[in-house]
Amino acid sequence: MVIGGDECDINEHRFLVAFFNTTGFFCGGTLINPEWVVTAAHCDSTNFQMQLGVHSKKVLNEDEQTRNPKEKFICPNKNNNEVLDKDIMLIKLDKPISNSKHIAPLSLPSSPPSVGSVCRIMGWGSITPVKETFPDVPYCANINLLDHAVCQTGYPSCWRNTTLCAGFLEGGKDTCGGDSGGPLICNGQFQGIVSYGAHSCGQGPKPGIYTNVFDYTDWIQRNIAGNTDATCPP
């Protein structure tokens, strides 16, 4: 869940995808068009499904849809010994999604985000930082996009040039366990994918690390067009 947030409005997360397997919910993702979902590479798993149109895990929406992955794409130049390297996965669904009251895609960004931007985080992950407590509904919060140097200092061994740093130096609001793969939305644009953070979520001075979606737009578009040999930025 999201630390320091509140229940999302039921109409603000039509693009948010819930990943689940036999053990239950485990990650989030973002619907970018009727056939494709973007999530974190570290969310890859066997025998998972994706639910769209979900708000409460206990109260069904009449337009919820479930899909299986048909194809999964991870950067061919990813260093598999480093979990957070190129932490992005593109998934083709087994059949297209129909737009509905609670389901609609979110477009890829048209420009990179700016430091200082107010960004929205959301997910069904833990709402408590230490002993995990998972809510039935997604929580949302606003955080700030910070300068790279903040996360380079906080996570010297995890920082990548293709990542974003977002949160608050004093802590308080953050993504947490179960939010991985979900979106970071800055000024209305899909700019980041939840990747990594401090093991005690929401604790300063370590904000969250997000994969920078803008850096991967060319790779995403090439794969959707059928060029599966496309490589990701270094």
Curated annotation (Swiss-Prot):
Family: Belongs to the peptidase S1 family. Snake venom subfamily.
Enzyme class: hydrolase
Misc note: Negative results: does not have phospholipase, fibrinolytic and hemorrhagic activities.
Tissues where this protein is expressed: Expressed by the venom gland.
Lineage start: Eukaryota, Metazoa, Chordata, Craniata, Vertebrata
Catalytic residues (UniProt): H42, D87, S180
Pfam families, alphabetized: Trypsin
Protein name: Thrombin-like enzyme acutin
Species, as recorded: Deinagkistrodon acutus (Hundred-pace snake)
Signal peptide residues on this chain, from the entry's feature table: none
Subunit structure: Monomer.
Function: Thrombin-like snake venom serine protease. Has arginyl esterase and fibrinogen clotting activities.
Catalytic activity, EC: 3.4.21.-
Any one annotated GO CC term: extracellular region
Keyword terms of this UniProt record: Blood coagulation cascade activating toxin, Disulfide bond, Glycoprotein, Hemostasis impairing toxin, Hydrolase, Protease, Secreted, Serine protease, Toxin, Zymogen
Domain Peptidase S1, chain residue ranges per copy: 2-225
Subcellular location: Secreted
GO MF annotations, alphabetized: serine-type endopeptidase activity; toxin activity
Keyword Glycosyltransferase: no
Biological-process GO terms, alphabetical: proteolysis
Disulfide bond entries: C8-C140, C27-C43, C75-C232, C119-C186, C151-C165, C176-C201
